[in-house]
Regions:
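Flexible coil/loop and intrinsically disordered segments
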Residues: 1-171
Length: 171
């Protein structure tokens, strides 16, 4: 099933963003579940109900389906190529200029989220560019990346990208 979705990558020549399977899982998980800690992914795929602290087959099944949707969005050729174009338009045209793979991962998760939320292409591109540059300048994902990813995606969901990005830029 995934082969048809990823076969275009075999001929892709861009080396700016070359994600491994961990990167793919991180982006898909952050985008679809609005969480950043892999321990939460493992718990959800096991059927963990965080409210009742029990395990339910229905949660495991829906979590697998949701993760699959996230992976499909990740490997979608149009999504991927537009994202790489956005990053290049910031001036980051070489892998050597990017200090943190997790800055790329979060920026891609943010792009997918904003598009799924119905934000227009131009507006979402603007936010993704600003987020990418800000996160690299301050080294946002260099240390405890999982905690920052988790915090950021939750704050974006709570406050909205406009307000949270402004808060981060003013901090």
């Amino acid at each position: 099933n995934y082969y048809n979705s990823i076969k275009w990558m075999a001929t892709a020549s861009d080396d700016l963003y070359v994600p491994d399977y961990i990167d793919m899982l991180r982006v898909a998980f952050t985008f679809k579940f609005s969480r950043g800690k892999f321990s939460d992914l493992v718990a959800l795929l096991s059927g963990r109900n965080f409210e009742t602290r029990s395990y339910e087959d229905s949660i495991a099944e829906s979590s697998y389906a949701k993760l699959s949707e996230g992976l499909e969005a990740f490997v979608n050729q149009t999504n991927y190529q537009r994202f790489v174009m956005i990053i290049k338009s910031t001036g980051l045209v070489s892998k050597k200029l990017i200090s943190s793979q997790n800055s790329l991962n979060f920026a891609y998760a943010l792009y997918l989220k904003l598009r799924e939320d119905g934000m227009g292409e131009a507006e979402s591109q603007g936010y993704v560019k600003r987020w990418m540059v800000m996160s690299m300048f301050i080294g946002r994902y260099s240390g405890s990346a999982e905690s920052h990813i988790d915090e950021d995606i939750k704050q974006i969901n709570e406050k909205g990208i406009k307000a949270y990005l402004k808060q981060m830029e003013q901090a």
